[in-house]
Swiss-Prot record:
GO terms for cellular component: cytoplasm; Holliday junction resolvase complex. One of its GO terms (molecular function) is ATP hydrolysis activity. It is found in: Cytoplasm. The lineage of its organism: Bacteria, Bacillati, Chloroflexota, Dehalococcoidia, Dehalococcoidales. Belongs to the RuvB family. GO terms for biological process: DNA recombination; DNA repair. This is Holliday junction branch migration complex subunit RuvB. Residues 259-349 are annotated as: Head domain (RuvB-H). ATP binds at L24, R25, G66, K69, T70, T71, E132, D133, Y134, R175, Y185, R222. It catalyses: ATP + H2O = ADP + phosphate + H(+). It comes from Dehalococcoides mccartyi (strain ATCC BAA-2266 / KCTC 15142 / 195) (Dehalococcoides ethenogenes (strain 195)).
């Protein structure tokens, strides 16, 4: 669906985000805002590895897009004082592609694989001995005379990032020494991120203006920085460049981002469930067909925040809009919905 490419409040990396993300990226754990428990545990692991003079144990980062998985990987490399090699699951098509990357790593280097859940099983199998034994097994020859040759690899750290933790195979998950989930940020943390970014970009913003952006950022730093940039442009053209509360609210209203950070596509998902399917429950594939979207995109991009807000429920029968969703959209909640939910509960569904 082409709309997703232009979606302002998507956590996915857009083409014009890369340069901005790099300029705003913190360079050490102490500058990384939010995710306190993750930071504390990761900081201990980094310090311990440095004190022992070892490579950091393999790290898996998972959670919705835009929460800082790539940023954390760069911070880990900087904190460890090592090089980082960046690639992605879809970019590694064959075993030979991964073998070429692994054999070019230097001692203690970091290999960052984004979307690691998209590695094929054949390629994934190359990682098992590489992660566990720092070795690469290659087949020499063909047919009955083929034999396995083991090449030693330098000790390195694999950092995997994924939005689909459940899609990782158990053997791959088990080989990560540290597994961290990144959660949506609370409004105070997003406020601090917007404030920091505004300072770096030289943008003048009042406290209420920062709050207006933060509350619409879906708990996602990438979205917060993107909205800040759009509001900055609006304030420059329509005002004197100062982001006030009214200026931010006016700008975001023009961009069709409501007070909770929902856009027209979020509204479309919820209204489709409510109006076309009686509020649900309805299957994911059915919703996808109704709004001309891929089921995976709905599950990865739209659902996490709607679930976080309590606007959507996943039930054994499918997706269901909650009373909160009706209230937010100013749609009367049907009286018979409570009775239906009671019957489902009695039936154990």
């Amino acid at each position: 669906m082409s709309e997703e490419k232009e979606r302002l409040i998507s956590g996915k990396l857009a083409a014009d985000d890369a340069k901005l993300d790099t300029s705003l990226r913190p360079r050490c754990l102490s500058d990384f805002i939010g995710q306190k428990r993750l930071k504390d545990n990761l900081g201990v692991a980094i310090q311990a590895a440095k004190q022992r003079g070892e490579a950091l144990d393999h790290v898996l980062l998972y959670g919705p897009p835009g929460l800082g998985k790539t940023t954390l990987s760069h911070i880990i490399a900087l904190e460890m004082g090592v090089n980082i090699r960046i690639t992605s699951g879809p970019a590694i098509e064959r075993q030979g592609d991964l073998a070429a990357i692994l054999t070019n790593l230097k001692p203690f280097d970091i290999l960052f694989i984004d979307e690691i859940h998209r590695l094929s099983r054949n390629v994934e199998e190359v990682l098992y001995p590489a992660m566990e034994d720092y070795a690469l097994d290659i087949m020499v020859g063909k047919g009955p005379g083929a034999r396995s040759l083991r090449l030693k690899l330098p000790h390195f750290t694999l950092i995997g990032a994924t939005t689909r933790y459940a899609m990782l195979s158990a053997p791959l998950r088990d080989r990560f020494g540290s597994i961290f989930r990144l959660d949506f940020y609370d409004e105070d943390a997003i406020h601090d991120i917007v404030s920091r970014s505004a300072h770096i970009l030289g943008v003048e913003a009042e406290e209420n203006g920062i709050r207006q952006i933060a509350c619409r950022s879906r708990g996602t730093p990438r979205v917060a920085n993107r909205l800040l940039r759009r509001v900055r442009d609006y304030a420059q053209v329509k005002g004197n460049g100062l982001i006030t509360g009214d200026m931010a609210a006016e700008s975001l209203a023009c961009l069709e981002v409501d007070r909770l950070g929902l856009d027209e596509i979020d509204h479309k998902v919820l209204k489709t469930i409510i109006h076309k399917f009686g509020g649900g429950p309805v299957g994911l594939e059915t919703i996808a067909a109704a709004i001309s979207e891929e089921a995976d995109t709905i599950m990865d991009v739209y659902e996490p925040y709607l679930l976080q807000l309590g606007f959507l429920e996943r039930t054994p029968r499918g997706r269901q809009a909650t009373r909160l969703a009706y209230q937010h959209l100013n749609i009367p909640y049907p009286a018979d919905k409570n009775n239906q939910q009671g019957l489902w509960a009695e039936n154990g569904t």
